[in-house]
Amino acid sequence: MKFVDSATVFVQAGDGGRGCVSFRREKYVPKGGPDGGDGGDGGNVWLRTNSHLTTLLDFKYRKKYLAPRGAHGMGSRKAGRKGKDIVIDVPIGTLVRNAESMEVIADLTRPDEEIMIARGGHGGRGNQHFATSTNQAPRRSEPGWKGEELELAMELKLMADVGLVGFPNAGKSTLISVLSAARPKIADYPFTTLVPNLGIVRYEEYKSFVMADIPGIIEGAAEGRGLGLQFLRHIERTKILALLVSADSPDILAEYGTLVAELEKFGHGLIQKPRLLVVTKMDIAPGDFVVPEAPEGVGLIAVSSVAGKGMKELKDELWRQVSLCERQAEPPEDGE
């Protein structure tokens, strides 16, 4: 399936139905008076998160969503039927903006979350509402009100606990395939990963966390070079970042520093997230290789996904940091 993480769609709620002009006509009621019913309200447009969706692909092929209008009012004070609401399913993690002003309308991050995005117009009043002491037979009614309409700019930001960041061919895809059930494309050339991959990492019996692998970034990514920039948004919601550098790198700490600099240039709070330096591909490290000293305040773990070296230690540390972030995010109990 093609991965699409941005889309623009037009939504329009239904117009309200027209109020009715009608008069009561019965054999023994010569002056029955007005009995025109009100028009029905137009249908609303809702957005709802669907945990089975992982992309905005559907919106590439369908660009307009129109809710039905309300039915017109009828005689005998019968109101028109309300227009049927329509519900548009989107993936969890969808950020919705007004495409014209780019104002954020909703950030949908919970399962089965719903929000009304466009309200249907009210139905017009029938002539029964306009009778007065001086006008007992009004021939006036109201048209229905217009339903709301707007263009939406939707952006998908994947929901994950751990984000994997590294240069192309740093071993991210192999790592996520070993730690989780994810099966990304893996090959020994740069830019194998062209779309983000999510993997669920099982930890002990009933614990797990979600890991996101994005395409490799290169120096200058924050200015638009390479593939990584357009996918950095997918690690904005992560709790921690694992920065991967291959053991065959000429200068591991310099490469790590470049990755950190790109995260800082991109902004959006990425540089404030807890980080872990992971030295990968220890199975191909030079014979005289020495694991460098970790940068201040940053943990360092050396692993080989192929040989399984260091993988348990890595999983333990990732779980520890994810759990710590979750505890820090919990609201304090009363009295604390």
Swiss-Prot record:
Key word Metal-binding present: yes
Occurrences of domain Obg (ranges): 1-159
Molecular-function annotations in GO: GTP binding; GTPase activity; magnesium ion binding
Composition skew (Polar residues), residue ranges: 129-138
Cofactor(s) it depends on: Mg(2+)
Keyword annotations from UniProtKB, A to Z: Cytoplasm, GTP-binding, Hydrolase, Magnesium, Metal-binding, Nucleotide-binding
Family matches, as InterPro entries: G_OBG (IPR031167), GTP-bd (IPR006073), GTP-bd_Obg/CgtA (IPR014100), GTP1-OBG_CS (IPR006074), GTP1_OBG_dom (IPR006169), GTP1_OBG_dom_sf (IPR036726), OBG_GTPase (IPR045086), P-loop_NTPase (IPR027417)
Predominant subcellular localization, coarse grouping: cytoplasm
Xref: HAMAP family: GTPase_Obg (MF_01454)
Similarity comment: family membership: Belongs to the TRAFAC class OBG-HflX-like GTPase superfamily. OBG GTPase family.
Assembly and oligomerization: Monomer.
Protein name: GTPase Obg
